Amino acid sequence: ANPGDVFDSGSAFNDPVYPQFGVQCSRETAIQATHNDGNMSLELVVESVTRENRDGGQVTAIATRDKFYPFYVTIYYKTYPDCEVIETWTEIRHLEKKPVTLYRFASAFLPVRRGDNWLSHFHGPWGAEAYLYEEALRDGMRVIKDKDGVRNTQNSCPSFMLTLDGRPDEQHGMVIGGTLAWSGNYRIAIDNDNAHTTRIFAGINEDQSQYILEPKEVFTTPVFAFTFSDEGKGGVSRNFHRWARLHRLNHGGEQRSILLNSWEGVSMNVNQEVMDQMMADFAAMGGEMFVMDDGWFGDKYPRNNGTSSLGDWVVCKEKLPEGIEGLTASAREKGLKFGIWIEPEMTNSKSELFEKHPEWVIQQPHREMHKGRGGTQLVLDLSNPEVQEFVFGVVDKLMTAHPEIAYIKWDANMTLFNYGSTYLPRDKQSHLYIAYHRGLENILKRIHAKYPGLVMQACASGGGRINYGLLPYYDEFWTSDNTDALQRIFIQWGVSNFFPAVAMASHVSVDTNYQTGRKTPLKLRFDVAMSGRMGMELQPAHMTDEDKAFARRAIADYKLIRPVVQQGDLYRLISPFDKTGYASLMYVSPEKDHAAYFVYKLEQYHNMPRPAFRMAGL
């Protein structure tokens, strides 16, 4: 190869670092563009390679340009030696006289020599998120993708592991793991070609998202993070967990509070008396924070059900005559921190906001609007700077008026239907999927800059936003709306492959579960919740005195193991997906002087001995 060609150096591959559609067109590509003169090809050559230390890692930048057109692509690699993770992304720009259309713009290309390669990936609908699927890779292409538009981790997840030497194992084997740090639509293509190579492409899903790139405009792709371990899938997980806590997750090294959320306890039936009672009961159990969920807002249209009021973020005085200040004062008196629920990206057609600004919702000309939850919910157009200002103002006004708010649960309960924007110009309607999430990120950056100590949870119909694109601004995610203890073992097992316990909200709910109707012992519900960021999701008034006493002891026990669970190294021992009737995992402190060991019995067998469980990490 010529020195200037964009080829990998020092490996057995003769693949470009960033494959382009152009002179050679027969393979999958990372980038495809059409110049304004109609030429659909690119031919990139290297102009320079630079290195610098930046924000805890070393960044290598490979600057390339087209041989003929003033079209430039810079490929970045950022290495983190303290966790053995590499981030990669690209910047695309041009100095042509007229716009260039981008049809493909991957964040990453990763070629892997084919052997006995196995893919581990995670799928599942609402209430059954992140179920593990494993398969041997055969000829052809495997595509993992999402097109929800708002939430991107219900149905599938932008993460995978590739075991290079046979069937996947937790503690043995050579494994590559990858995850896309993006909150919008994504596409991960794993292509087994006839040259005995597995070629991996990861980035934004380009379907209905061709991008008109103006001269001098810079298009930056999301980060794709990847790692390698010869200690099996568990080694990959521990690398990602360290990377998250040290470099990616907001307040990643800080201890999380034990909280009670009001949703499953009282739904939208909030009022001052009930909130005071729940706080008093939880404080007596040793709790640390109370979070008031949906149902507290709406003036003209009080929020009594899911059909109205989103966008009208003012206190419903009928329910809370003392306002939020009455609740924060009550929490303070009881020694609790206070949090609140919002869904600021959404509105209802039955709301004062929609009556005032119908142009702010995502919509199409000459089409009837398809509405979501309650038959009235609509998505606000975050590509519009006025809407971004409004959404930022929701949080800013709450925090300015009530600085004692310590926690915000940020929800998003609708798919992006009615694809169209009254803000974007006619020739850039295809930007909406991307512009929506860039608008969301702009809002979150402003909130983070002004309120750096504020703790926020990413919720989206449960576990719809479990991704590293948002976690620099959120401290945790709601893992699933399904709080059934048995099913949570499976869900949390899947999520733990890429995300640390400190970010994984796991709540104790009632004995007849809200979603499944299953009855489970209180001890099991606490034991499962203790393996993540533990909280509660019930009405304490419905607990017996015996259950309250047990909860006090369990909360005290969790406080003892919280440092090792939230900041320790995870070792998954017996998988619930192996169908042995058991699941087991443990957390080990970095100094290896403390450990928390969990064993769950999933099925009841008569007169069957329990298998031996081998610990790890000590």
Where are the regions that the model predicts?
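Carbohydrate-binding surface patches
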Residues: F160-L162, E170, P576-G617
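Polysaccharide-binding surfaces and accessory modules of carbohydrate-active proteins
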Residues: A1-D191, D207
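Active-site neighborhood of glycoside hydrolase catalytic domains
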Residues: C316-E325, A329-E333, E355-K523, D527, ...
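Short Pro-Gly-centered flexible turn/kink motifs
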Residues: A30-A33, V46, Y211-D230
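Short acidic, Pro/Gly- and aromatic-enriched capping/linker segments at domain boundaries
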Residues: N194-E214, G453
